[in-house]
Amino acid sequence: MQFIQNTILGFFDSSQKSYEIPVYQRAYSWEEANWKTFLDDLLEQINGDNNYFFGNLLLEVIEKNKKYEIIDGQQRITTLSIFFRSLFNTTTKRKTETALEKFSSTDKEIIFLRNGGNIKLRPIQYDRACYDALIIDNDINFETCSPSQDKIKKAKKYFEDALDKLETKIILSILDK
């Protein structure tokens, strides 16, 4: 077993990397208390109150430097990608010149969500259509059909609402972490 310390950007950095959640993993289950802790931890790091530690992830290499299965950490990684979709939506709504100079949603989407046909995170089949519609394609009209899909949709809304309340400079500083 090999341990590698990495940043969030380093985790997603390659246009070829993709992560799949194996069929035996549970569906998305995080709720508001988890989302709040996730966001609070990020904001504390920005304020210098702590060094955000995302935690350990256990990956199985399927194809070296390209394809991995997430054995442990799938709830955190799924939440992170939902958070980034919400972050992209929030910064896109804000028309400040500073935000536009610093943040290109197209560039960040390529890094964190997809590059062409390569989707970075593939949830379990049960949640995949929902995830692709709400997070990858940003379809606001997608109708959920399960508790886990409801949670994906609610997480996206939770983060968008929370980010809407923050100053643009704070939101942009999240991208630097």
Task: Please state what every model-predicted region is.
Residues 1-177:
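Glycine- and hydrophobic-rich flexible loops that cap the catalytic core of alpha/beta enzyme folds
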